[in-house]
Amino acid sequence: MRHVLAAASALALMAGGAYAKELNIYNWGNYTNPKLIEKFEAETGIKVTITDYDSNDTALAKVKAGGHGFDIVVPTHTYVPIWISEGLLAETRPDQMENFKNMDAKWVDVDWDPGRHYTVPWQWGTTGVVVNTKYYSGDINTSAIFLDPPEELRGKINVVPEMGDVMVMAIMYHGGEPCTDDKEVLKKVHETLVNAKQHWLGMDYGNLEKFAKEDLWAGVNWNGSTFRMRLQNEAIAYGYPKEGYPLWMDSVAVLKDAKNMDEAKAFQNFVMAPENAALISEFARYANGIAGSEAFMPEDMKTAPEIVIPEELKSVGKFNGTCAPETQALYTRIWTDLQK
């Protein structure tokens, strides 16, 4: 009952415009619609400041170091249990907030936050391959695009430096399952990645413009980011590797040491409104987890090949869990070697 009263109190403040504070959001770069923030500020009177990060590990390390001043963070699902176990997140009980009724039922009882006691959906998507079809006309639904690159693409490949995504794709390419500790599979993964890297131009995050301008021709990227590339260059296509590819969800969480706790809870409730979730998707070009948001979405998102997974490739997409620490250590060793 205490949780219900607290949530009701926060919502009453929001409705009455009684906030006079601020909200500090720590989120992935180029991932937050300015229109969403403007709407939230107009409705609540809360001044929002956004700080960017480029990886889950960067965000986790920054917050663990302390003195950050952030209220909200948006981790990927595989990292949420880590944030919770480290005691970094507040149990804000989104399941008792007014707009929780809008959450799509399939996103409620998730492995990383059963019943949604800590987090609310921000965006969900896939990690696959991006190819400029002007320079390559072969099969793009394969991780061989970056793991055994065709001659035409060598030297023009960029791989996002997100260990979880790249390792899962390489493991599934060799017939393994996410979070495997099979030494034979991991030996093949290590050799394949090291050999493939000589054909990559880089391992960077902020590459949307480089793909659009054709400085890059292929690589590993997220579906929404690739969608935004295609809007600038129609030759760009997104592939779903038939060997397997990661599914993921980023969620809004409130930090336990947030100075603006009520404001942060109000933001969690705010993004569960369908029209607000649609604003997030409109900008970032990913799906969200809020039922009814489709009615407010741009028309081109409803049929986009980066959003609508081909029927024959749906079954090979996997939501991988949080790997055991010992397994994660094996992956980290491979990843560290790849950075040399």
Description of each model-found segment:
Residues 69, 74-215:
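Extracytoplasmic ligand-binding site segments that recognize negatively charged/polar headgroups
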Residues 102, 186-194, 232-256:
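Periplasmic-binding protein-like
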Residues 130-135, 171-173, 249-263, 279-282:
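A bilobed periplasmic-binding-protein/Venus flytrap-type ligand-binding module shared by bacterial periplasmic
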Residues 209, 311-340:
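Conserved C-terminal helix/tail region of periplasmic/extracytoplasmic solute-binding proteins
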Residues 255-315:
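Mature extracytoplasmic/periplasmic domains
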